[in-house]
Structure formats: C-alpha cells, structure tokens
A protein has these predicted regions:
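Patatin-like phospholipase
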Residues: 1-37, 45-283
Length: 283
C-alpha cells in the first residue's frame, strides 16, 4: 500500500489544513507521498518536520504585523507576503523550521508551481526547504499581490492557478490510498473573476492568461472528480464541516484559531473512518 496526501491551497484557509495535520501528528500518521499547492505547501511541510502547532502559533503571533502580510509590504516590495520575513527571518529565527527532521521524514513532498510561460503546473520534489525556498515561495505567490518567482531560468506564480488540488500527480506517483484535505466546505462552486485584472498585469503571458481564464471550470471539474471518487470509496476526503469566514489573507487571529480548531475537530470526528479506509481490502 502506498498512501498519498493531497493538500489544497487557499491562503489563510490553510489553517484548516494545519488543524488536520496536527491531528495526524498526534496519531503518529505519516503518508508516503504529500502533494500540495500554495498554503498546502507552506503549511504542509510542517507535517514532515513534525512541528505540531507551529503554523497556528506563528500566524496568530504575526498576523497584523506589517513585516509579514500587509499593504505596506506590497507597496514597498511588490509582495503582500513579505518574502524576507515569511521565507527567511521567520523560519530561520523567529519560529525555526526543523529542516533536519524534515529531511529525516520517510515521506516525499511535492510542491505545485505554475510556469508563467507555459501556463502549466509543474511538480517539484522538495528535498531541502532551505535550498528550494524559491520553489516553496513560488507555490504560494498569488497573482497581482506577489511578484513572480524566478527559478531555473523560468518565472513562476502560485501553483493553484494551474492545479489547486494536485490529485492527478498523487495518482501518477502510484498512490493507491489517497487522503484529500480541502479548504472549502461541501457544495462550494468556484466563480471568481480575477481573469480580467490579470490581463492588465501579465499581457505577455498568453498561456498563463488562458490557464487563469479556465481556472474556475478546471477547479469545479476537479471537485466533481473528487466527489465521484469519494462516493466510490477510492479516496478519503476531509473538508470543513461548516463555513467560517476566513479571507485568503485573513488578519483576524481569532478567525484563524477558529478555523484551525474546526480542522482539529473534523479530523478527530472522521479518524476511525479514515483508519477503516486505509485498512480496507485486508491491507
């Protein structure tokens, strides 16, 4: 049996995912493969480093701090999420990320990024977070409010533009048991309208603009696929059991705590079912 874990993006809605991952750590659960996008990457790496509570702790501690996520950072650096603070000072000094434990993990971790030239998703195995911090940052570089990230001679943006729920990659890697953590409740239908604005910011990147234009349809089709596979018992889905109003760049620490608590409660509520799914068919 090869177990995969798929982590949807969603900015600060990823605090729900962090709650689910904290329950996994409490239960000493580690998949063989993790495929994440955006916040599913920046928060998901903490499962491999076994740092329960870290995502909630640093987000609640620094939310509202203009050095972290702020209009001030956007106006002065071009990045609403300040790259020097979020991807250097914070993980190295303020709330250190345990790279040694990450590298000891038996799991492999893939980050999804969107190539601006091709408009396609690329999946990069993260073997060392410090050496590949640009990939991690690219996966969560939201269009317009974050600068593109250059890596290996190409420019990249948020992986969620091309593949917000990297299920196909997880299947391609041979996982026969797949757990999917979503950040939207059942029945959510994407209908955002960023395509027109992106034409003003990225007029030279025609393939990227096409990907963005198709983003709603592709996301909704992915959810339909997941719902079908879930009904067939082929994947196990953990999603918010109720709606909590949390924005992509939420600045209210109480809302973040509430969403994290919901992730914990939902994961605990389905844990026995998850174990049954993993051991079904006599495995």
């Amino acid at each position: 049996m090869k177990v995969g874990l798929v982590l949807e993006g969603g900015g600060m809605r990823g605090l729900y995912t962090a709650g689910v991952l904290d329950v996994m750590m409490d239960n000493h659960f580690m998949p063989d493969v993790v495929c994440g996008t955006s916040a599913g990457v920046t928060f998901g790496v903490n499962l491999l480093s076994q740092q329960k509570g870290r995502v909630l702790r640093y987000n609640c501690r620094y939310v509202g701090n203009k050095r972290y996520i702020s209009l001030h950072s956007w106006l002065t650096t071009g990045n609403m999420i300040n790259k020097d603070f979020a991807y250097d000072l914070l993980p190295r000094s303020l709330d250190p990320f345990d790279e040694e434990q990450y590298e000891r993990s038996p799991a492999v971790f893939y980050a999804t990024i969107t190539n601006m030239h091709t408009g396609e998703a690329e999946y990069v195995q993260i073997t060392n977070t410090w050496e590949q911090m640009d990939v991690i940052r690219a996966s969560a570089s939201l269009p317009i409010i974050c600068q593109p990230v250059e890596w290996n001679g190409e420019k990249y943006l948020d992986g969620g533009l091309a593949d917000n729920i990297p299920l196909d990659k997880c299947m391609e890697l041979g996982c026969d048991k797949i757990i999917i953590v979503l950040t939207r409740p059942a029945g959510y239908h994407r209908n955002d309208h960023i395509s027109g604005v992106c034409h003003l910011f990225y007029p030279r990147y025609k393939a990227l603009l096409k990907t963005i234009a198709n983003r709603n349809a592709n996301y909704n089709a992915r959810i339909e696929q997941i719902n079908r596979l879930e009904a067939e018992g082929k994947v196990f889905v953990i999603r918010p059991s109720r709606h909590i109003e949390v924005g992509r760049l939420e600045q209210d620490a109480d809302r973040l705590r509430a969403l994290h608590a919901l992730g914990v409660d939902d994961a605990l509520g389905v844990w026995e079912q998850l174990e049954s799914y993993l051991h079904k068919d006599g495995i």
